[in-house]
Amino acid sequence: MYPQGRHPAPHQPGQPGFKFTVAESCDRIKDEFQFLQAQYHSLKVEYDKLANEKTEMQRHYVMYYEMSYGLNIEMHKQTEIAKRLNTILAQIMPFLSQEHQQQVAQAVERAKQVTMTELNAIIGQQQLQAQHLSHATHGPPVQLPPHPSGLQPPGIPPVTGSSSGLLALGALGSQAHLAVKDEKNHHELDHRERESSTNNSVSPSESLRASEKHRGSADYSMEAKKRKAEEKDSLSRYDSDGDKSDDLVVDVSNEDPATPRVSPAHSPPENGLDKARGLKKDAPTSPASVASSSSTPSSKTKDLGHNDKSSTPGLKSNTPTPRNDAPTPGTSTTPGLRSMPGKPPGMDPIASALRTPISLTSSYAAPFAMMSHHEMNGSLTSPSAYAGLHNIPSQMSAAAAAAAAAYGRSPMVGFDPHPPMRATGLPSSLASIPGGKPAYSFHVSADGQMQPVPFPHDALAGPGIPRHARQINTLSHGEVVCAVTISNPTRHVYTGGKGCVKIWDISQPGSKSPISQLDCLNRDNYIRSCKLLPDGRTLIVGGEASTLTIWDLASPTPRIKAELTSSAPACYALAISPDAKVCFSCCSDGNIAVWDLHNQTLVRQFQGHTDGASCIDISHDGTKLWTGGLDNTVRSWDLREGRQLQQHDFTSQIFSLGYCPTGEWLAVGMESSNVEVLHHTKPDKYQLHLHESCVLSLKFAYCGKWFVSTGKDNLLNAWRTPYGASIFQSKESSSVLSCDISADDKYIVTGSGDKKATVYEVIY
């Protein structure tokens, strides 16, 4: 390591001819120190040079990673577009005359024959257009600093080769580089000036600091994108235990505030690339982990330092909720649109590509030109939204555009309750394109074909359709609110928590304390459902106990009128017949108990669910009952004949359901985060995708024109019946476990995991 000519070591004392002096020894030590210092300095300079090269290599690697990722998405996107266009052509061709059919078929075949020469010419033309566009809008592009190893920077890839792959990469790379923001140009200039000054500097540490400062401003952000993409890929490969609610314990602590929907850079309702972030952090030791009233079962109540206080057995389903990897009865899938339980469909890279519009400039716009913008349900109805990554607005890179575009709100949503949460990163041209947002409502035909729903022009307008809802009161219950119900006429709200139901008078604005408290069940057992009889004088309460409690509210002080005891250790949901003579209770053993309220006796049980029955609703005429269970089934029962009519099988546990008061439609909330709207006789259905986690409760408005659903993702969503246009959306601070709508459709009440109920006024 050291040259042979280094200073010799001093002779040992006693050798002949040596005279020891302190000054000479000091001089030798000084020379040795200077030599070592010079060696150290040269090594330091070499180290700094290598560190700078490493930084540059990492930066280039991230750039190429972005480009390859974007190309992969683009390839899948264009493949899917081609499939869909072929399907459309195949459907339209039979309507043509025989002569025209032959001409069209020949034209289609010719269109499929794309030679390498044509491909190279097209890519070269796109490069020229992008360069002219960049010169016109931003002036001359700022070139990258010279690469230390002599490699060509990605902004100027070679275009002389005949390989179409290299040409495609070059086209994308050059345009991605030319489209960099002015702010980044400033960073590049600043970095180059700093490099030129520091390369001549004596102190290499200054150079290192300068390069690290530049890296912090530009490269770390790209590495963050890369990490996000890798995180997304890993999340799509397996199901997180945090989102698998087989034991049906819902985290009721305040959820991670860093969920994408809270971020001010994103709009609430869309499913996008990084949607799963922040949804995996559940607190299983929350002392109040419980699910929703009348809609969501809970097999356990987890308490710190305690065993399960409820006599409810663990109801973990023997049938694990499978991933929706293949088409199964009840959950239809389309290539590239596979949905994972507990995760949005956008988590699949292919699905995210299909759901992420980039630009409107495309030759595929014609087949859908007849649709007006408010008829579209996001991007999938408009193939014109799928232009190549080379058409990305200049402010955005491929990955950034994909992530940002995935969060824009659909144009048919008439009211945005969170204006600060809109996707501020989107340029106005992209944020306002018609139909350029991800689809969230799909029609699933009898043969499993999934298509985005074209909304009618009156989807969000007309009599009986609300514009939005505003929060007017908060009822601090003090425990997790698993059950809520509203009196008719609208005056009192009943909130069920741990061991008691509290009654609130909402006719008095600003009322902060309950007017009464009904202690029932055991103190440590949660109320799961409470239902008022139509006369408003009787309240029936069920929960994590084998007993249903009937309260007389007409007496001066509410009192227990009777108790109904079943063999099941818990009741998850209740329903009352329209004539108020019969009560139906969903039992944790899967049975549906039928109670005669006048004689206070059990008159029959509907048996069919192989796991706990979680949710229930009754038809408006009182002839049909609908139940959902942890066995992944929804069943309908004929109340006159006392037998099962239908059974719908799904790939996810059923947590909530509601039957439309005007008939025909049944809405079902899933553990997999989907809402499905079924027709009572037809095999086709609608599938809605705005929730990010389990759908815990669901309720139809009494007019039947809309319904609301709430979830573990803290969201309250209002939907149009039956096709699911999003009317409004509200985000709470914790899981929303229960909900109810007043008989006049003017108020909504929700119960949540942060120990309160929220009263909303519906604005028309």
Swiss-Prot record:
A motif (Nuclear localization signal) lies at residues 225-228. Residues 132-199 are annotated as: GP domain. SMART domains: WD40. This is Transducin-like enhancer protein 3. The modification Phosphoserine is found at residues 203, 207, 211, 217, 240, 245, 263, 267, 286, 317, 410. Highly expressed in adrenal gland, small intestine, kidney, lung, ovary and thyroid. Detected at lower levels in pituitary, hippocampus, cortex, cerebellum and testis. Transcriptional corepressor that binds to a number of transcription factors. Inhibits the transcriptional activation mediated by CTNNB1 and TCF family members in Wnt signaling. The effects of full-length TLE family members may be modulated by association with dominant-negative AES. Residues 269-444 are annotated as: SP domain. Ubiquitinated by XIAP/BIRC4. This ubiquitination does not affect its stability, nuclear localization, or capacity to tetramerize but inhibits its interaction with TCF7L2/TCF4. Ubiquitinated at Lys-712 by UBR5 in response to Wnt signaling, leading to substrate recognition by the segregase p97/VCP and degradation by the proteasome. The modification N6-acetyllysine is found at residues 232, 275. There is a cross-link at residue 712 (Glycyl lysine isopeptide (Lys-Gly) (interchain with G-Cter in ubiquitin)). Residues 197-207, 284-299 have a biased composition (Low complexity). It comes from Rattus norvegicus (Rat). Belongs to the WD repeat Groucho/TLE family. The modification Phosphothreonine is found at residues 259, 312, 319, 321, 328, 334. Keywords: Acetylation, Isopeptide bond, Nucleus, Phosphoprotein, Repeat, Repressor, Transcription, Transcription regulation, Ubl conjugation, WD repeat, Wnt signaling pathway. Residues 200-268 are annotated as: CcN domain. WD repeats lie at residues 476-514, 522-561, 566-605, 608-647, 649-688, 690-729, 731-763. Induction: By kainic acid in the dentate gyrus. One of its GO terms (molecular function) is transcription corepressor activity. Residues 184-196, 209-247, 272-283, 300-309 have a biased composition (Basic and acidic residues). GO terms for biological process: negative regulation of canonical Wnt signaling pathway; negative regulation of cold-induced thermogenesis; regulation of DNA-templated transcription; Wnt signaling pathway. Residues 310-322 have a biased composition (Polar residues).
